[in-house]
A protein has these predicted regions:
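Metal-cofactor-binding active-site regions of metalloenzymes
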Residues: 1-159, 166-172, 178-180, 185, ...
Length: 302
């Protein structure tokens, strides 16, 4: 559509580039491909296609990350990004899917860039519900962005952040995210199992973990399934999620299936995880009750 040369000319050639063995190799493919997104319709169409797939997978609540700095850094206005995505959110809601956006900061960019991004995004804060932190974790601890997250909390936004698996300093970053920056959830974050005190903290404070088995499987043989099981047994609210599904080859149903088959999980195990995902969602208590009731009905009827 936009005449952008990304180095491949067919779907098969694009898919052949999806060879990842760590976070760095994934990001090397992930960011250049964004160049095809140029106008508001592009962002809308991308999100709308995702929501359609999510609904087909039985998703009833979707909280989706987006990385505005990956676009503003190449000259795309932040309102183009937010408005395009939000149009798709509104349409998804009209079709019966509860959906919201979470604005993420790129941790391998400066804290000043993150702060500027938040400031220019705040006029649109009715279009997103929270902020997160992602990209290359090496030498980019959460504390680098303490002032940014403090401002976000003051603005009434929810807070989460990636604590990617098996990173140098994982436990220190998890501790800082929870105890210093006020994270309500951790994205990935299963290394928390290495510190019993942090596991207890997560249980006591209702911290949710959004784990992604299929993307985990690209960088570790066991998709962190044993950690998911151990944390769930300890009372941590772990959920299963898709992670850049177009790249990692699986939407939410594929993640549930892969985890269940690899670790011989029962219906009750998967039901608990599904309930966790609702209980840690950033929605009203009334909506949580409605969605949990839908789980009850599904379990009783199937």
């Amino acid at each position: 559509k936009n005449g952008v040369d990304i180095g491949q000319s067919t779907v098969e050639e694009v898919q052949a580039t999806y060879q990842f063995n760590d976070l760095t190799s994934f990001l090397a493919v992930y960011y250049p491909a964004m160049d095809v997104l140029q106008d508001e319709d592009d962002f809308h169409d991308l999100a709308a296609a995702y929501f359609e797939r999510a609904r087909a997978n039985g998703v009833v609540r979707a909280e989706c990350f987006f990385d505005p700095q990956a676009h503003t850094s190449r000259g795309i206005a932040i309102e183009t990004v937010i408005r395009g995505y939000h149009r798709a959110v509104v349409e998804a809601r009209e079709a019966g899917l509860s959906a919201d956006l979470i604005l993420c900061f790129l941790r391998d960019m400066s804290a000043e860039s993150a702060l500027e991004t938040l400031q220019v995004a705040l006029p649109y804060k009715d279009m997103f519900i929270g902020v997160g932190l992602d990209s290359d974790e090496r030498d980019n601890p959460p504390t680098k962005f303490a002032d940014v997250f403090a401002l976000a909390r003051e603005a009434g936004l929810h807070v989460t952040m990636h604590c990617d698996i098996d990173q140098i300093g994982s436990i220190d970053n998890i501790r800082a995210a929870l105890t210093e920056l006020g994270a309500e959830r951790l994205d990935h974050g299963t290394n928390i199992v290495e510190d019993p005190e942090l596991v207890a903290y997560a249980c006591d404070h209702g911290i949710g973990l959004t784990s992604c088995p299929l993307s985990n499987s690209f960088v570790t043989e066991e998709m962190k399934g044993k950690e998911i099981i151990e944390l769930t047994a300890a009372g941590v609210k772990v959920s299963l999620n898709s992670d850049d599904p177009a790249y990692f080859g699986g939407y939410i149903g594929d993640n549930y299936l892969a985890f269940a088959e690899r670790f011989d999980r029962s219906r009750a195990d998967l039901e608990r995880i599904a309930r966790n995902s609702i209980e840690i969602a950033w929605i009203s208590e009334e909506e949580k009750a409605e969605l949990l009731a839908r789980v009850d009905r599904f379990v009783s009827e199937n």
